Amino acid sequence: MFLFKILARNYTVVITESLPLGIYKLYPIEDIKVGDIVQFKPDANTINFIKDRGYLPKIADTLIKEVVADYNNRDEIKIVYDTNLKLNLLYVGEKNYGPIYFKDSRGRDIQPISLKDLKPKNSDEFLLLSSHYKSYDSRYFGLVNKKQILNKAKIKIKF
């Protein structure tokens, strides 16, 4: 049992398509930079929303996402309207992180964050996204503060 607790504390399993499915090793944070995969604890309202919607199992209380923007590249965050798709797309630099929806995959209302509120205002705020089109990420729950980030994560076993 003791060994299991040590393993559980140092690893996590990604079971949604926000990132590649698999087992991720958790590492202490020395610094946080764009491109890092991080484990974080969303605020209570976000956790309750996620659980009420069934986006994650009831036992989950942390999320894992990629850091795609910080204070240094905040001006690269933009929303571009795609006339073919008739959707707003979220870009950071030249990378398209996909549509911003007003309904989730089950047709329920979902409220995206405004462009202004997606841009970090100081060095302790980060935009965390996934390029998976159904991801529930910062475009809906907002920026994540450094205090909420628990660990860095790297995939060790891909499913």
Label the model's feature ranges.
Residues 1-7:
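Hydrophobic membrane-insertion alpha-helices, especially the h-region
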